[in-house]
Every structure is written in structure tokens, then in C-alpha cells.
A protein has these predicted regions:
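N-terminal pre-ligand scaffold of iron-sulfur
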Residues: 1-52, 57-64, 70-72
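A basic- and aromatic-enriched beta-loop-alpha substructure that forms the phosphate/nucleotide-
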Residues: 66-67, 90
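C-terminal catalytic domain of Rieske-type non-heme iron oxygenases
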Residues: 3, 45, 76-250
Length: 250
């Protein structure tokens, strides 16, 4: 078993995404977190079990938002609450994992950088000459121990698949733990609602990470006739009913 001595207690006492839940089977699968070798597998009852390599004692774990969460320490609370995920008209769009040769903290910082839009996501999330980052509000919400940035806005030529042209997009950023951050942005088809983009960062080594981005987007493509079916499936999921489903078969 690899030592976790290089990881301080503050980093150990966090919840981390380490894999997509659909990629975990009954066969033990190696993984790595904070320089520590792990194994993950599904137990006979479908429960995901995460252990340190060479140690049969199960680590705390959760299956949440389509991902496996675990910790090497004692987190002060449960993983981040994302209430929008329970909304029936949301599309679940996983976009990873992506191996990044950088510190997990740097990956989060890059995600929070508005200024890169016109230069990295040219003609999609930004374009010259619209390069100015306008003033916005940043605060640490001590009562929930989160960092929030609000009143962010940026001109975007193609802010979303549902956008029909360039719009000034409103943003909110939410950092819920050192390696978990969420972005809320204007949804072109739903006034007063937000598309939600999450970045769950898995620090593998001090200078290597796996990024697990996922989007929960308001769905314009689901036919009205299917909305009842979608809601029924979500209701079953809330109750934990899986008998006869593809999830159970896996």
C-alpha cells in the first residue's frame, strides 16, 4: 500500500469522485487517489466497495450523481448537494474522465478563469473583441464554507446547443470543496433557470489529476409525450427500485 504521508489532513478529509459508477463491475478495478493505490468493485448486492490496495477494510463511499465518491479521511459532511440533478427535464452529460498533468488545485483554478473564454473556446464561449471580464462579486459563504462568484457575465457566440445566436451569458461559480466546483449558466430556453456544469477533480499525484466533468442541462429534445416516462424513471430511482432494469443487470 502506498503511503499517504504527503497528503495533509485537510486534503484527506474530503470527498472525491474517483470513477463513473457505470464503469465499476464485480471485477476489482485499480484506481489511485492522493498517491494511494485503491481498488473498487461491486459487491454481490450491487453496492460499490472501495478499499486501499492490500487492505480489505472498506473506505467510506457513496454512489451519487452517476459517480463513485470516496475519502481517505473523515469529511465533516456528505458530498456536495446538487438539487438540480433531481429535476425531471435535465439531461445527464458526462464528459470524462480526462487525465491532466497538473495539480488538482490548478485544474480548479483554470475552470474558474473567465478570461480564457475568447482565446481557448473561440467562437463558442467567447470571441474577440469581446475579451473584457466585467466586475463581479466574490464571497466566502462562511455559514456553508463555500466560495461563490455571482453577477458574472460574458458575451458568447454559442453559449449552448440550444442557443440560436450570440448572447450575454450570466454565470455563477460555486466551489464547495478544494477539488469540487460547479458552474451555473444562463439556459437559453428556460428563463430563471440555470444549466449546471460540474467539475469533480481527482488528485492522483501532486502534479497529476483526473478531471470528471459532467453537465446537467435543461433538455429541449425530450418529446412532451416522454416527460411522464422520464419522471417515472426518476421516481423509481429515488425509491431505489432497480429490479428488471439495465442498472440491476450491470
Amino acid at each position: 500500500m502506498t503511503s499517504t504521508a504527503t497528503a495533509e489532513k485537510a486534503s484527506l478529509d474530503q470527498w472525491y469522485v474517483i470513477d463513473a459508477a457505470c464503469d465499476v463491475t464485480s471485477a476489482p478495478k485499480p484506481n489511485r487517489l492522493l498517491s494511494c493505490d485503491l481498488e473498487e468493485k461491486r459487491d454481490h448486492d450491487g453496492t460499490i466497495v472501495v478499499t486501499r490496495k492490500g487492505d480489505r477494510s472498506a473506505l467510506p463511499s457513496r454512489e451519487l450523481y452517476g459517480y463513485v465518491w470516496t475519502t481517505l479521511g473523515v469529511p465533516p459532511s456528505e458530498p456536495v448537494d446538487i438539487p438540480e440533478v433531481a429535476e425531471a427535464d435535465r439531461q445527464y452529460v458526462p464528459c470524462g474522465p480526462i487525465v491532466v498533468r497538473a495539480s488538482g488545485l490548478r485544474v480548479v483554478e483554470n475552470f474558474l478563469d473567465l478570461a480564457h473564454f475568447p482565446f481557448v473556446h473561440t467562437d463558442i464561449l467567447g470571441a474577440e473583441p469581446h475579451t473584457e471580464v466585467k466586475p463581479y462579486k466574490v464571497e466566502i459563504r462562511r455559514e456553508i464554507d463555500e466560495v461563490w462568484a455571482t453577477q458574472c457575465e460574458f458575451y458568447q457566440p454559442q453559449a449552448a446547443m440550444t442557443a440560436t445566436g450570440g448572447i450575454v451569458t450570466q454565470y455563477m461559480y460555486r466551489v464547495t470543496s478544494p477539488f469540487v466546483t460547479l458552474l451555473y449558466k444562463t439556459c437559453p430556453i428556460a428563463a430563471n433557470r440555470w444549466d449546471v456544469i460540474c467539475l469533480f477533480v481527482q488528485p492522483v499525484e501532486p502534479a497529476e489529476s483526473r478531471a470528471h466533468p459532467v453537465m446537467f442541462l435543461i433538455d429541449q429534445t425530450t418529446p412532451r409525450a416522454d416527460i411522464m416516462s422520464v419522471t417515472y424513471r426518476r421516481w423509481l430511482k429515488e425509491k431505489g427500485v432497480t429490479y428488471g432494469t439495465a442498472e440491476r443487470a450491470a
